[in-house]
Amino acid sequence: MNRNGFTLIELLIVSVIMGLVISIAIQRFANTKEKTYLMTMKADLRNLVTAEVVYSTDSLRYTTLIGSGGLEYHVTTGNTGPAIALTLDGFAASMGNTNTSKTCSIFIGSTALPPATDEGVPACR
């Protein structure tokens, strides 16, 4: 007997394998999106530090103002904040993103803002 085509078992096995491969690919894509949101928040916080340094060079102090009379600074679409707090010897700032529940922070000076623990290095949780 000469058969053409595939048996039901063969088709079922191929479908299961394809389902596994697709589920792995979707999970990796979701992780990549989360990492992208965190990277944009960290980049925005580094840019904030740069803007604060430029501002303090002219005015000899840091500021919480963004825009007219304050920092020349723009936030990436999707990022929220920054919330800037002046400290005795610098400032601390935090930022969120509308697509994730994680937040990132950075500080300059001696007053850390968790999750940041190293001065000038943004950290997220």
How would you name each of these model-derived features?
Residues 10, 39, 119-120:
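Compositionally biased non-globular segments, especially hydrophobic aliphatic-rich helices
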Residues 15, 42, 49:
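Conserved catalytic core of two-component sensor histidine kinases
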Residues 50-125:
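Periplasmic/extracellular, small/polar-rich flexible segments of pilin-like filament-forming proteins
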